[in-house]
Amino acid sequence: MAHKKAGGSTRNGRDSNAKRLGVKRFGGETVLAGSIIVRQRGTKFHAGNNVGCGRDHTLFATANGKVQFEVKGPNNRKYISIVAE
């Protein structure tokens, strides 16, 4: 009588889906109002001129223009602004 005992269970076998975070529009690119510039967790980038910040810290353009990245302030924070053309 050939028998195989139960193999037991494992605590592995899960993985979350990728969240597609990151910069969507880079410096110098022309954007329209409402365009998403960065999807992020927390404020790695801060909203500058003509940029809004969503509930999930997504940065988006509030005016048409070119994307500009800048580092300023005593803590060297990264700001994203839209410069009108």
Swiss-Prot record:
Kindly give the SUPFAM superfamilies that the UniProt entry links to this protein.
Answer: Ribosomal L27 protein-like (SSF110324)
This protein's UniProt keywords: Ribonucleoprotein, Ribosomal protein
- Any single GO CC term annotated in Swiss-Prot or TrEMBL for this entry: cytosolic large ribosomal subunit
Q: Which GO terms describe its molecular function?
A: structural constituent of ribosome
Instruction: Locate the region Disordered.
Output: 1-21
Question: Highest taxon of the source?
Answer: Bacteria
An individual GO BP term: translation
> InterPro entries attached here?
Ribosomal_bL27 (IPR001684), Ribosomal_bL27_CS (IPR018261)
Q: Which family does the entry's similarity section mention?
A: Belongs to the bacterial ribosomal protein bL27 family.
What protein name does the entry list? Large ribosomal subunit protein bL27
Q: Which gene name does the record give?
A: rpmA
